[in-house]
Amino acid sequence: MSLLHIAVLLPLIFALIIPFLYRFVKRIHLGWFVLPVPIVLFIYFISLISMTMSGNNVMKNLNWMPHIGMNFNLYVDGLGLLFSLLITGIGSLVVLYSIGYLSKSEQLGNFYCYLLLFMGAMLGVVLSDNFIILYLFWELTSFSSFLLISFWREKKASIYGAQKSLIITVLGGLSMLGGIILLSLATDTFSIQAMISKASDIQNSPFFILVMILFMIGAFTKSAQVPFYIWLPDAMEAPTPVSAYLHSATMVKAGLYLIARITPIFAISEGWVWTITLVGLITLFWASLNATKQHDLKGILAFSTVSQLGMIMSMLGIGAVSYHYQGANSQLYVAGFVAAIFHLINHATFKGALFMITGGIDHSTGTRDVKKLGGLLTIMPISFTLTVITTLSMAGVPPFNGFLSKEKFLESMINVTHLNLMSLNTLGILLPIIAIIGSIFTFVYSIKFILHIFFGSYKPEALPKQAHESSILMLISPIILTSLVIVFGLFPSILTQSIIEPASVAVSQTSNITAEFHLFHGITPAFLSTIGIYIIGILLLISFSYWVRLLQAHPYQLTLNHWYDTSGQRIPGYSENITNSYVTGFSRNNLVIILGILIALTFVTVISVPFSIDFKNVSHLRVFEGATVLFLLIASTFIIFAKSRLFSIIMLSAVGYAISVLFIFFKAPDLALTQFVVESISTALFLLCFYHLPNLNRYNEKPTFKLTNAVISIGVGLSVIILGLIGYGNRHFDSITKFYQEHVFDLAHGKNMVNVILVDFRGMDTLFESSVLGIAGLGVYTMIKLRLKQKNQSSEVNDHE
């Protein structure tokens, strides 16, 4: 196992240890024991930067189930390293922040267990080279985020938000799994890098479009794109450290990572470029518009996050255009990838800080309602300074890092209008228009965020707590992130060669990418668009109280949340009605449906697929075998027409004994002995049970009832006979008997083949069967114990009376 594997597994190992450690260190905040884990990992991943800068990548292999292609292979390139640094870097700051945010009276053992579980899962997602392993980690992020969002499980809103996020993201994950399976069919591998090298084979596959759609659904649900964004605002019920970690820098970026990673496979499709770009832009516009009408600070940040994710998604779509060109034209559109990577980093810095500042305000005032807040400028001056810097960066105002990536975004959108590809030379004008409108509303909600909190009149009577500045532990992390906002804005070259260019190379599959960012690069269309955004944004701020009422008047019945809630209420009822229509509570009726479907499937398969039934090698029926079968049939007939339950049991036992005789004829004495013992015990148990049951008379059955039973019985019998003959006559592989004959002694050191198969070759199966019998025995013992206890209690009551 390599050091890279240990780095991925380290948070998962600590997640198992932390709950036990919590029992012994309750006097010290548990976060101090967790903090070294992400810090050590962050330092380790920083040490890999020089490797990716030089153009080298690392592949570490660990065989797990190689016979089915599931190996725990990890791959580090510029893209994976970027996300690993975000996961561990922001994770370190979040853990530090949580020490001040969460009191020692909280269930810290559970919280940090879930947080480390999520951290390890995210590292597994961004570093896995095997798609199946990636999927397992992908679902683990959904599961751990569910636990984190519902951490305050006494709140109904937390449970609702957690369930909503789990349902939507898991459905998206299942969609992605379908795409993974179809991809493996086209490439005969689960390795991501191998699939990228076989991109041409995938593009020629008949499943190409379907696979592309399935992967996009998985990515859109995870990164909260339209129409799947509705889970993210409700997930804000999580503790603020969770929101700062999951919903700014990590989980919501997993979908972006997936799109970036598989772009080399699907970018050649025009549908990929159009869909990724338009979905991203529509998400940017719709979420930024909705952010302006929110009253909850975390609600504003939630829709802000959705809009920023849409912005990055659209940039990845524009970057995919580079796959359709060569040379200088290709480099022109690679700028979309560069802008996406840079804004990915910028968003993690300013949004992570904003979530932490919001948590501090909530902690200090007891509310996040903008109607109750205001006038906190003099009371929380440090928080005010941090908020101004980070929100201006989010709004795209210089000299902060958000301005640089916003300019690159607008430049990419304007450049794409000159394309003579996919009708972009005509319809492409829509892209910068949507981008500019979305950016205008981004500017509006960003400035309004500052005004809501720190300006206006101070309303102490409306606040649950007396307002005060956040503690130093809750300020250190946002101060660090805000400092990075300034540093990356003034000195973006710190990131270009070390992080941005290697990550862009991994997405674009090209070399010699040069990332350049300038605070001012002349009077360009992008610069003029920015000036227009500021002017229109200021005008909308002045008239905010007038037009925001129109947005708030939007009826709830027309929202996606209403459709989700309505579906959640009605689908269980529909499912119950459908289930009750065929699950009637009567075993006979249930068996009729199950066996009827199996019979139908058998005969449809036999008719539609050509099979050959060969009677040449079938052995001749001997007299004593025929006599035994005849006896078996007669006994079965007696069971059907028997009037007495005792006689039915005897005939049923006769059938079992006849089968054991057949086993003897077929030279299987072990099976015959087992069948004989089972039949004897079953008969005894039947008789014992019937002795204690009331004497019920046989009732007259309807003709349709008897006819159905006869049809099902005959159909099952014919199905088994036909399948047996088909299986006997269509042997496409050598018999496995030879393998057991050759290896029973040398591998298992046994002479009885049947026993060796049961105990060694099928040992786990036999063990589980024994476990089932043990569980059944415990159930019977429990029922007997309870009955005896009830008898004793009733006798005591009678004695007392």
From Swiss-Prot:
Keywords: Antiport, Cell membrane, Hydrogen ion transport, Ion transport, Membrane, Sodium, Sodium transport, Transmembrane, Transmembrane helix, Transport. GO terms for cellular component: plasma membrane. May form a heterooligomeric complex that consists of seven subunits: mnhA1, mnhB1, mnhC1, mnhD1, mnhE1, mnhF1 and mnhG1. Mnh complex is a Na(+)/H(+) antiporter involved in Na(+) excretion. The keyword Ion transport applies. This is Na(+)/H(+) antiporter subunit A1. It is a multi-pass membrane protein. Signal peptide: none annotated. The chain crosses the membrane at residues 1-21, 30-50, 79-99, 117-137, 166-186, 206-226, 228-250, 265-285, 300-320, 337-357, 373-393, 427-447, 472-492, 522-542, 591-611, 623-643, 646-666, 671-691, 707-727, 764-784. It is found in: Cell membrane. The lineage of its organism: Bacteria, Bacillati, Bacillota, Bacilli, Bacillales. One of its GO terms (molecular function) is antiporter activity.
